[in-house]
Amino acid sequence: MESCNCIEPQWPAEELLMKYQYISDFFIALAYFSIPLELIYFVKKSAVFPYRWVLVQFGAFIVLCGATHLINLWTFTMHSRTVATVMTIAKVLTAVVSCATALMLVHIIPDLLSVKTRELFLKNKAAELDREMGLIRTQEETGRHVRMLTHEIRSTLDRHTILRTTLVELGRTLALEECALWMPTRTGLELQLSYTLRQQNPVGYTVPIQLPVINQVFSTNRAVKISPNCPVARLRPLAGKYVPGEVVAVRVPLLHLNNFQINDWPELSTRRYALMVLMLPSDSARQWRVHELELVEVVADQVAVALSHAAILEESMRARDLLMEQNVALDLARREAETAIRARNDFLAVMNHEMRTPMHAVIALSSLLQETELTPEQRLMVETILKSSNLLATLINDVLDLSKLEDGSLQLDSGTFNLHAVFREVLNLIKPIASVKKLLLLLNLAPDLPEYAVGDEKRLIQIILNIVGNAMKFSKEGSISITAIVAKLESLRDARVPDFFPTPSENHFYLRVQVKDSGVGINPQDIPKLFIKFAQTQTTGARNSSGSGLGLAICRRFVNLMDGHIWLESEGLGKGCTAIFIVKLGIPERLNESKPPFMSKVAVDHGQTTFPGLKVLLMDDNGVSRMVTKGLLLHLGCDVTTVGSSEECIRVASQDHRVVFMDVGMPEGFEAAVRLHEKFTKRHERPLVVALTASTDRMTKENCMRVGMDGAILKPVSVDKMRSVLSDLLEHKVLFEC
């Protein structure tokens, strides 16, 4: 035994125990060697593993542990020192590696524990995300239902259809057993069952609006759960054996109460709502979920908006119908007014013609009598007749002018005229009357007043004569001054007339005319009345001088046509009166100073001029008028030939006739003028053709000018007027009075 290098076991081996230890060490070694292989396999399969060095150490530790158990198989029997040395080395290495691994695990284990914490956190986060996704899906589903319901609700603008559709769609979407709408009554003190889901024509149950449950619902815009046994929820036809389903109620704002015929809300009440009640089925355990309540609230708001739109549409349709009725009534009134205006104009035209014809006889014969030898008493009577006839003729002219102004048919006849000559003509016309009444006339024309202007000369003269005539009528003594200036733009603003807006321009100017008298004056409160047609003041001493009351009314219309303004000023009775008017006149583009292209109608006193031997042809189908006009012409020394028809006029007319007076109101009157031009082709051979008419309409003048007449004279005609007409015609002046 001394030569054997073996280590004896310390105790005798038992065969059975040795056998079990041997087998156990073998399997332990096998397990230790398989674990690193498994770790290596799964680490290679893993894309991310942050602890590779730890794995190497752990693998080495396991391999060494397996090696010690494997070497330990040779230590159960007699073994050499070499085996003991290998065993020792293996255990030392195992101890070193195990200690290093243990030290490394001190740093690794917290990370491994935190990984578990993160895992739990991620699981919780994932669960939360799942819940949020569920909410999002629920919201999307709710939104889809809201859009669908909104589309159905707003697909019509009929109020009843909107409410019926709302109940049907809510019942289908939420699977409701019943859905009802309670509307306020006319008094606003009760709610009436108006619409239900299951009943087409619900019985009109009513409940007081002051119920606590109704106050609770009306106090919030959220859906409120209410008791199934409250009055507004008792809508089920059969009680059934199941527990009633949950019931919610929500208010529906009524934005347009008038459309619901609610007239008498309580004085302090702001509860302008309807009540919508929704019931879940009784045979289910369903409960109202949050998203369903939100859906109900949104639908209630959409119903309110749709009802508002429907109410607005109903109002607009009623307004349209009312407007159509008003338009029909206005159109009927317009047609009636046009018919009345045409009838009035036709009446005035006929009366004008029929009145001027006998007036022509009265004035003509009176003027003829005035130039005969009469006693003072006879002359006074003739002058009175002539004055009254002229006044009546003026009244006829005023009525016709006012009629044309009112229906808008009167238009200004603008042309270039001598403005200074207009004022001189007015002065010449009023001088005889002023001299009789011993009134001093003063005319002041501003140095910068243009000599020529563009406008309606005839209407301007008419305005000035009317105003000056009024001044003379109400002035027994003293003076009358006429002042004409170019108005400065800054002085035209008048606070009393806010709608008068003069505009500056290089092509026109504003003429300001002031007529001041020392007459009886006017009460300041009576001034506005003077511009009303047919209105007259009770001025002392003026009643005997009053006229028709149309003069100033017509003047105002003419001034307005000329883009002007007229007003009166007076400090009171006995203190005189000042009439001021402003009109807009044009400035001529250029003037030929040597020979103006126009002639102003300045009054010329022809005295007792006669026309001995002047051959005149007179055509008139009215025997009285023909006789009177012939008398005037004979009185002026003319050789007169009279005819009663156009055919006879064409046949009788010759080169010897200097003037042809024809009544264009008779049949074929204008045609006769045309045929005269055809008969006398040369201008110097044709007699002057003048219309003698009682028509004052614009068409008559246009027709006279169209057929080439040399003038148009308006009846009635006096001796002086006929004398002036003949003088102007022989001087080749064109005269158109109508």
Swiss-Prot record:
Role noted for this protein:
May act early in the ethylene signal transduction pathway, possibly as an ethylene receptor, or as a regulator of the pathway.
Matching entries from Pfam families are given as: ETR1_N (PF25487), GAF (PF01590), HATPase_c (PF02518), HisKA (PF00512), Response_reg (PF00072)
Query: Cofactor note from UniProt?
Result: Binds 1 copper ion per dimer.
Q: How does it sit in the membrane?
A: Multi-pass membrane protein
Question: In the UniProt record, does the keyword Ribonucleoprotein occur?
Answer: no
High-level lineage: Eukaryota, Viridiplantae, Streptophyta, Embryophyta, Tracheophyta
Query: What sort of enzyme, by top EC class, is this?
Result: transferase
Where in this protein does the record say Phosphohistidine is found?
H353
Q: Where in the cell is it found?
A: Endoplasmic reticulum membrane
What is the organism of origin for this protein? Passiflora edulis
* Enzyme Commission code(s) on record: 2.7.13.3
User: Which SMART domains does this UniProt record tie to the protein?
Assistant: GAF, HATPase_c, HisKA, REC
Keywords attached to this entry: ATP-binding, Copper, Disulfide bond, Endoplasmic reticulum, Ethylene signaling pathway, Kinase, Membrane, Metal-binding, Nucleotide-binding, Phosphoprotein, Receptor, Transferase, Transmembrane, Transmembrane helix, Two-component regulatory system
User: Which catalytic reaction applies to this protein?
Assistant: ATP + protein L-histidine = ADP + protein N-phospho-L-histidine
**Posttranslational mods:** Activation probably requires a transfer of a phosphate group between a His in the transmitter domain and an Asp of the receiver domain.
What GO molecular-function term can you cite, just one? ethylene receptor activity
Coiled-coil spans are none
Q: What is this protein called?
A: Ethylene receptor
